[in-house]
Amino acid sequence: MKKFLFLAAALLALGISTACADSDRPIDVAQLPQKAQQFIQKHFAGEKVALAKVERDFLEVRYEVIFTDGAKAEFYKDGEWKEVDCRYSSVLAAVIPAQIAQYVSGHYPDASIVQIDRDKHDYEVKLSNGLELTFDLKFNLIDIDD
């Protein structure tokens, strides 16, 4: 009987967690956190939004905005930016920390930053030449991937 109850509880928990996980739904830009809205107004003024959505994983909420030119911005639940991916153009200089911009322009003068991603451990930038550079939070280069 104990095994049956344990199995039933495990299946119920699995069903609930599966139902809550991986829930993506489109939203209006006005439903984004205030910081995310301000970021878009400042750095993507004049760009048309193709899709804004909220992504809910088990314990995490993120927002993603895709623009009609193919650029994408991803935000944490508090509205701080997580990733900016411009695919076909350079990430705006105002988004890139000055130390990273200086390193890239000094070491890769013919390349531009087309994607930047940050988390609580590091910054990752993708260059137009295909290289991916990783910097720690003190902006020291810690990895290069090609």
Task: For the regions a language model picked out, list residue spans one by one.
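Bacterial Sec-dependent N-terminal signal peptides
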Residues: 1-24
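Interaction-mediating elements
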Residues: 22-146
